[in-house]
Amino acid sequence: MTGRYAFILAGGVGSRLCLLSERRAKPAVPFGGKYRIIDFTLSNCVNSGIFDVGVLTQYRPTSLNQHIGIGRPWDLDRTRGGVQLLQPAPGLATSDWYQGTADAIYQNLLHLKRRRAQEVLILSGDHVYQMDYNVLYAFHRRNHARLTVAVTEVPENEVSQFGILETEANGHVVAFKEKPKTAASGRLASMGVYLFDRDALIRWLVEDAAMSHSSHDFGKDLLPRLVARGEAVYAYRFPGYWQDVGTLDSYYRANLEFVQPKPPLDLSDPEWVLHTQTADRPPVRVAAGAKVTRSLVANGCSVSGEVVNSVLFPGVVVEKGAVVRDSIVMHDTLVAAGAELDHAILDKEVRVGRGAKVGTGDDMTPNRACPEHLSSGLVVVGKQARIPAGLVVGRNARIGAAVAAEDFTAPVPAGGVVDGPESMH
């Protein structure tokens, strides 16, 4: 068998991203001024010479499907290979939906068997990193592994968020614990990057599908089972930058890392291009008297006010006297004259009225609807929300998608919630 094939798991809900993923799949969330999160994984594939890719979608797939399309930005619009969007095809039973990451691959076994690949790469579509998968393939073959898991070392206080692997000196995995409470098992976290021998993967998936007690998930079921019975599972230590942006705080921090003088990844590297789907936009316009400091400003933006340590996506307008500070502002949003944003994340097509203040005060009361996700001082505003002139919005507030100006009856206190209608994408 020849060739290479990759599955990208892109159907997760991403509830910890709050409003940003309520109406779109997590891999479709915008990132870094012009990209979407899945662009990193797709670009890693083509930059590594993998041009046959299946993207498994399920939750709110519309934005993701529209973004990927036929794969032209990634040179994946091909007669042979290319990109295929693989959605579940449910019948009358709800069990036809993908029940877990392993089940998602199992339901596409026929698709896999048609591929002439000796190994199968299975990737998460919601992480920020740049990896040459050729190095992973070489490690896998050198160790005669059946499964190789890419791992990275995480801080001790974050081990409970990841699957943690224990290894021997040669990388052979001797133990695996899914989201342990302590770092007793070490700090080597699974990156959600798996390289399987094709035939072994097929056999293991069929075996797992027959187990009624299994949740059919790679991290919860398959990987622990394979390690426990001594299969040739190896861990490849990835030395580069890798970020799981699955929470509002991690998403916010990762975006702002890219405005620093030395960002964690070189997004302008001609040897490792980060491809994406982009619309034609005019150049950035910076008016006389405007001030832009340490920020990413995408095409089509017009800045007449002040932008500090922020990320502006295409088409954002910052009027005279407006201040955008430590914030992420998505496509075609208007920040009107005299308005101020501080530690805020605004989704697409938001309108912030004159003199409004979004993210203000010292009160750090956690959000009353999602305190576990919104407690560090960030304000999140949903797509197409309309914030009226002069409104004051406290820290940790959540303003829903498509909220109208008349939906606000008073200032929004710290931790406050203003909900909008459903059905926005």
Predicted stretch roles:
Residues 1-5, 199, 206-425:
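Left-handed beta-helix
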Residues 1-259, 366-378, 383-384, 413-425:
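Unchanged
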